[in-house]
Amino acid sequence: MKKINVAPENPQYRIVEIFESLQGEGWNTGMPAVFVRLGKCNLACGWCDTDYLTFGMMGLSDILGRLKTYAARNIIITGGEPTIQPHLDMLLDTLKAEGYFLCLETNGLNPAPPQIDYVATSPKACYAAKYENSCIETADEVRIVADGDVLAFCENMERKIRAHHYYLSPCEQDGAMNIYDTIRQIGILNSRPDASVHWQLSVQTHKWAGIE
């Protein structure tokens, strides 16, 4: 007999943190939002600034109760990598039913759930080979961290991902940010005679402002 998987009534989620702030990067910079940071990731970038392995389990009802204490109606589901979270669909269905605008921040190796209103994908150049076999096809914005010479990777992501906005972000390691080299690479991308998209700079303005 085939086993039927039934979702629990109050599923548990790996929660790193939930907090209200302003979106600090990309097209929606400045947008008031509640960030729901989920634990665990299917990549392990050396420069990642998120402790996605330190999390606690939290039930769906408690998550919803926490969200209702905030004024913002925009929810940013981030990580870690949200698309590997068990019972993600149930969480998203519940939030949509409550009338929230749902944004997803993902590395783009898995498809975005249909409940999402805005997809910001950040493919990782240090895992370029993985994107040859699995890659999201559409997004609202693409944000790539310039953790080296990423020109060829950016061109490949242009071909693989149809998006409205394309951003290159500086990489911060050991307190230093390679902003000059990031701007230089943006200039090269935008000066190509056959350039089909326009790349822009995205920086983590929330860090400069001293907010979460």
Swiss-Prot record:
Domain of life: Bacteria
Reactions mediated catalytically: 6-carboxy-5,6,7,8-tetrahydropterin + H(+) = 7-carboxy-7-deazaguanine + NH4(+)
Gene Ontology BP term (one): queuosine biosynthetic process
Keyword 4Fe-4S tagged: yes
Note describing how the cofactor binds: Binds 1 [4Fe-4S] cluster. The cluster is coordinated with 3 cysteines and an exchangeable S-adenosyl-L-methionine. Binds 1 S-adenosyl-L-methionine per subunit.
Residues that, per the record, bind substrate: 22-24, 37, 78
Family matches, as HAMAP family: QueE
Record-stated family: Belongs to the radical SAM superfamily. 7-carboxy-7-deazaguanine synthase family.
Function: Catalyzes the complex heterocyclic radical-mediated conversion of 6-carboxy-5,6,7,8-tetrahydropterin (CPH4) to 7-carboxy-7-deazaguanine (CDG), a step common to the biosynthetic pathways of all 7-deazapurine-containing compounds.
Subunit structure and binding partners: Homodimer.
Protein name, entry field: 7-carboxy-7-deazaguanine synthase
Species for this entry: Neisseria meningitidis serogroup B (strain ATCC BAA-335 / MC58)
